[in-house]
UniProtKB/Swiss-Prot annotation:
InterPro entries: ATP_synth_csu_bac/chlpt, ATP_synth_F0_csu, ATP_synth_F0_csu_DDCD_BS, ATP_synth_F0_csu_sf, ATPase_proteolipid_c-like_dom, F/V-ATP_Csub_sf. The lineage of its organism: Bacteria, Pseudomonadati, Pseudomonadota, Gammaproteobacteria, Alteromonadales. It is a multi-pass membrane protein. The chain crosses the membrane at residues 10-30, 52-72. One of its GO terms (molecular function) is lipid binding. It is found in: Cell inner membrane. The keyword Cell membrane applies. F-type ATPases have 2 components, F(1) - the catalytic core - and F(0) - the membrane proton channel. F(1) has five subunits: alpha(3), beta(3), gamma(1), delta(1), epsilon(1). F(0) has three main subunits: a(1), b(2) and c(10-14). The alpha and beta chains form an alternating ring which encloses part of the gamma chain. F(1) is attached to F(0) by a central stalk formed by the gamma and epsilon chains, while a peripheral stalk is formed by the delta and b chains. This is ATP synthase subunit c. It comes from Shewanella loihica (strain ATCC BAA-1088 / PV-4).
């Protein structure tokens, strides 16, 4: 029983940690490319900004889905039925 709970805790930590890391990398790339595009064509900056915010929202959604799955695994422990 302790092994299953321990492995579940490790899986939850990896899921949340990797989701946060991926989001941070994604936001860094997104912001950098937005600044490059706005510097190259300043007249396109408002349109690029709208698209950047849409993609930023999708990046956050992926992380929140990962957190939801992690909390589901943590509190319901679907692997507990294997015991």
């Amino acid at each position: 029983m302790e092994t299953v709970l321990g492995m579940t805790a490790i899986a939850v930590a990896l899921l949340i940690g990797m989701g946060a890391l991926g989001t941070a990398i994604g936001f860094g790339l997104l912001g950098g490319k937005f600044l490059e595009g706005a510097a190259r064509q300043p007249e396109m900056a408002p349109m690029l900004q709208v698209k950047m915010f849409i993609v930023a929202g999708l990046l956050d959604a992926v992380t929140m889905i990962g957190v939801g799955i992690a909390l589901f695994m943590l509190f319901t422990n679907p692997l507990g039925a294997m015991l």
